[in-house]
């Protein structure tokens, strides 16, 4: 571990405030080095944290946390905050089972004012805290720290609109690094990055190209020209940012300050001290660089957004979570990405939509091959779904690639704008089930429950890679709204067809014939069901569809077996197991049924296998639970 004499003194923001302001740049260097060391060992979100070091130090130096409230949007950039608030010695446990969460979590620290993980919630939460303080006659300050990527979501502007009309002491810090996970899209980022600045950069490049050879021959001239160039760039950027941003945010009722260099910690302290003394809604526009201080991350902030580890000093390259070593088995995301490109090559009506998750959802190749049919709408899930509805109305075939946890954010649009009108929109629902290190805010445990009650919806859950392709093709050709949900990570190793074969909608298949006990399994739980069935001589049905569900198969299994076990990687409440019970009740069948899913609990973060075991859904746990449930404890016999 690199020596860090200042950082070693800090176990709380109170310790931080004992430092002289002139010591803060040195502390920032030590904190950045500590991040490189700790994230290099544990993995986790990387580039965004490097870009927020000075801002985090300045905020805790000026504001009286935890009395004053800091609300971090999304939480990708919260590692420096955790280090400065007493969790430095636990950073080696980051995102591991039983260790620190990768996002702010209220039950983890009094300094984590609001639990986050999803985008664009910070302004609304901080506004609620500020309003409470006003009602109680307090004098605390509430601060929302939000990135320019998160500002592309409507919820952020809803909160700005509300805050500007309220007489509360609220500071919104706009951390502008021109990135979310991928480069930002839409009109707002273009608004923040002015045309004048781009024109100035172009002019300077032209001047350099035309005069560089001459200046090289004059001693000292090139160095002087570079200083002038830098000054012109800085002045142009500051003037244009201030002019445009002032107009936007002051029209919302905020007093605008900025733009300010987000890596000049001493100046940030001065600016924040002034802002803390002001009354009413304030907005501070801070310019930072994602990955600051680590050249590889600065040059490729998308790749280094999240990492698995760092190389030893002098190492050539850092492997990223987004580019794992080649695996023999493809991930479900890769299967979807290939199917999407294959389908688009055969059908010019296919269009793909993502809410700012191009890399994570497997759309990089599609964007490269079909740029005119690729739509990244920013962090705007609600708009993504309604936009897809408009495309479908005019004869296009939209595919919305979205994580299960983020589809929750667009539920009204899914119901009102898609399902009630029976529009043929296909939802490719990635990260369904347990996701591991990202924890409960990113777990996809509710989609079967909230999708199967929606009229006109087709809901499918593949059990392996090839079935994923089959069900994508099947649901794409259905003249109805449909969702195919699949888990994070690699599949089972099943050979994947290159064709566009389809299956009958609403029909499952028998994977194994057995006696007495029937496993009715959905999606990712088919594999553990088969493993357990071998030991218990049980029948296994791969249902494929949750809606419409195969009533005929369920009734046949119920009448030919003594008992039924349902398995799903979804909440038990309202899930696929409940659908099976509804079928049995409808047909007047009374048989013992064991529902195996995620109980009514908030899951933790950590290794997915460990989490599944704790939830009773690993093959070993399923076998144990079934044996305990069997009336005669004699397995299936």
Swiss-Prot record:
It is an enzyme of class 2 (transferase). Pathway: Metabolic intermediate biosynthesis; 1-deoxy-D-xylulose 5-phosphate biosynthesis; 1-deoxy-D-xylulose 5-phosphate from D-glyceraldehyde 3-phosphate and pyruvate: step 1/1. Coiled coil: none annotated. Its cofactor is Mg(2+); thiamine diphosphate. Binds 1 Mg(2+) ion per subunit. Binds 1 thiamine pyrophosphate per subunit. It comes from the Bacteria. One of its GO terms (biological process) is 1-deoxy-D-xylulose 5-phosphate biosynthetic process. Thiamine diphosphate binds at residues 76, 117-119, 149-150, 177, 294, 381. InterPro entries: Dxylulose-5-P_synthase (IPR005477), THDP-binding (IPR029061), Transketo_C/PFOR_II (IPR009014), Transketolase-like_Pyr-bd (IPR005475), Transketolase_BS (IPR020826), Transketolase_C (IPR033248), Transketolase_CS (IPR049557). Mg(2+) binds at residues 148, 177. One of its GO terms (molecular function) is thiamine pyrophosphate binding. Its EC number is 2.2.1.7. Keywords: Isoprene biosynthesis, Magnesium, Metal-binding, Thiamine biosynthesis, Thiamine pyrophosphate, Transferase. GO terms for cellular component: cytosol. It catalyses: D-glyceraldehyde 3-phosphate + pyruvate + H(+) = 1-deoxy-D-xylulose 5-phosphate + CO2. Catalyzes the acyloin condensation reaction between C atoms 2 and 3 of pyruvate and glyceraldehyde 3-phosphate to yield 1-deoxy-D-xylulose-5-phosphate (DXP). Belongs to the transketolase family. DXPS subfamily. Homodimer. This is 1-deoxy-D-xylulose-5-phosphate synthase. It comes from Neisseria gonorrhoeae (strain NCCP11945). The lineage of its organism: Bacteria, Pseudomonadati, Pseudomonadota, Betaproteobacteria, Neisseriales.
